[in-house]
Structures are given as C-alpha cells and as structure tokens.
Amino acid sequence: MENRSLVTIAEHSKEKILYMLEMAKQFEMNPNRRLLQGKVVATLFFEPSTRTRLSFETAANRLGARVIGFTDPKATSSSKGETLKDTIMMVSSYADIIVMRHYLEGAARYASEVAPVPIVNAGDGANQHPSQTMLDLYSIYKTQGTLENLNIFLVGDLKYGRTVHSLLMAMRHFNPTFHFIAPDELKMPEEYKLYCKEHQIKYIEHTEFTEEIIADADILYMTRVQRERFTDLMEYERVKNVYILRNKMLENTRPNLRILHPLPRVNEIAYDVDNNPKAYYFQQAQNGLYAREAILCDVLGITLEDVKNDILL
C-alpha cells in the first residue's frame, strides 16, 4: 500500500498544495464532520507543544476520530530505554495514524520507514514542520488572495526555526522573494540557501531590522529565538532580544501586509502590535485546525471530493 505519510512539505507539488488549501477551505466552512468515524489518531509528543498538539487533537475529534497518545515521554517506556522503532511499532498496532513531534532531526523520516501506518511530522528538531507550513500557506493565501510573487520577510531564528525551513521549501512553486533577517549566529543555514539557488528562489540577507527594510513586505514572518536549541546559554542571552517588532515600525508598511508568527511568542512582537489590523498570528493559529483536518483526511485517503460530498453536521 502507498505510504501517505507527511514528513516534509518538499514532497508536495504545487497542485497538491493548492488541493490541500481547497480542502482546508472546506473545513473552515464547517469543521464538524464524521469522515474519520471509527479511526484512532495517536499523538506522540517527545517535545513540548501547545498549538500543534491541541489543534491536531481538536481536528481529530471534530472529524469523529478517537485520540490516544502522550505529551511527556518521561511517563512512557522510552524513559526505560525503549527505542523509537519499538514505540512506533507498538503504537501502530493501536492507531490508524501517528502524529509525532521529536527532538531529533530525521526522526519523522525514520518513523515513516518503519511504521505500518502513516506518520505526520509535527516537528523534528530544527529540521521540518510541514503541518505548520500548511496552515502558514493557508493564512498567506487567505490574506493576500494568492501565493504568487510575494515579498516574504523571515525574521529572527532562521538557523533552528523549522517553520521557516519548511515554508521556504513550500514557496518554491510560487516565485517568492525572500528577505532573511537574522543575526550572524542565527542566519539561514547554507543548505537552505543552496536550496534557494537550486530552485531559482530569490533571497536577500539582512542583519538589521528597521522600518525601512520591511516597508515592501507582503508577509512579515516573525520567529522566537529558541532557547531549547542552544547548548551555550550565554549565546542565547546575547541574541534573544535582538529583533523586536513594535507598532511604530508598521506605520509605512504596505496596506496588505500581514504579520505571522508560529507562536509561542516571547519578546519579539510587542504587545501593542496585537491590536494592529496587520497582526494575523492568532487567526493564523486558528487556521491550524482547518489545515490539520485536511492533513488527517488526506493522509488517511479521504479526497477533496469526499469532503465536498460529506453531509454537514
């Protein structure tokens, strides 16, 4: 049987991305369905999560599925030395699909190769976060009316930020111009800049974060500096507040600008920005429900036509 796992957004074609966005739109019209009645969704979170875990579990519940899983690996047999493979094999015997977050880069790929059920990557270390990318794409499409020819500014932790890595790969189909704004310690890794060159993705690098630089942005994608990725806490303290978006910086930006953030926020967006109509990060998080309903259905073989023909409850 075809493995329908979602490990990286790089495996999605342009047509597939647009198909998934249309499916998310259907779920926004009515999120309450019974398309996954009788299915069991396992959520295995080896790292902390609020939005990703809760939105996947809410998506499963709204689709009629049951949810099992854990949020604290210390309370599981992995703390006794059980291997990831054994954990995956055991959970596969209980569930129809596994949503997994893990601290090791490549863990989702490995799980997809050993599991008899589909794996959805809910974040693997500093590597990829494809479900976040799907809701980011949906948010961009909703606010801009297109994914084509946009100026997208990625700000903050571009080294460890798996959300920006996935978004960059997904946007290769839509002729974006990226602006990478990061201190030298957190700049976009060379492998992703090489990816841009291989796919003719335009990008410009900055170390300064000013209102002049962001004046032409369509999307301003803020990220937090991730303390948990640093082995040297002195280095973290040095860079954690390097860029802070303040309301005054938005006065001369484009009318269509929207500010996105994968959340949680720490200090990188001042609270007075929340009331600015260009702030979209809380709506973005809400879009996660619809995008993840689409992901669960697609991975389990339910088509867009099935969703459109489903009786709304």
Curated annotation (Swiss-Prot):
Carbamoyl phosphate binds at R51, T52, R101, H129, Q132, L263, P264. Pfam families: OTCace (PF00185), OTCace_N (PF02729). GO terms for biological process: 'de novo' pyrimidine nucleobase biosynthetic process; 'de novo' UMP biosynthetic process; amino acid metabolic process. Pathway: Pyrimidine metabolism; UMP biosynthesis via de novo pathway; (S)-dihydroorotate from bicarbonate: step 2/3. It catalyses: carbamoyl phosphate + L-aspartate = N-carbamoyl-L-aspartate + phosphate + H(+). Keywords: Pyrimidine biosynthesis, Transferase. Its EC number is 2.1.3.2. GO terms for molecular function: amino acid binding; aspartate carbamoyltransferase activity. It is an enzyme of class 2 (transferase). L-aspartate binds at K80, R162, R224. HAMAP family: Asp_carb_tr. Catalyzes the condensation of carbamoyl phosphate and aspartate to form carbamoyl aspartate and inorganic phosphate, the committed step in the de novo pyrimidine nucleotide biosynthesis pathway. Belongs to the aspartate/ornithine carbamoyltransferase superfamily. ATCase family. Heterododecamer (2C3:3R2) of six catalytic PyrB chains organized as two trimers (C3), and six regulatory PyrI chains organized as three dimers (R2). This is Aspartate carbamoyltransferase catalytic subunit. It comes from Bacteroides thetaiotaomicron (strain ATCC 29148 / DSM 2079 / JCM 5827 / CCUG 10774 / NCTC 10582 / VPI-5482 / E50). The lineage of its organism: Bacteria, Pseudomonadati, Bacteroidota, Bacteroidia, Bacteroidales.
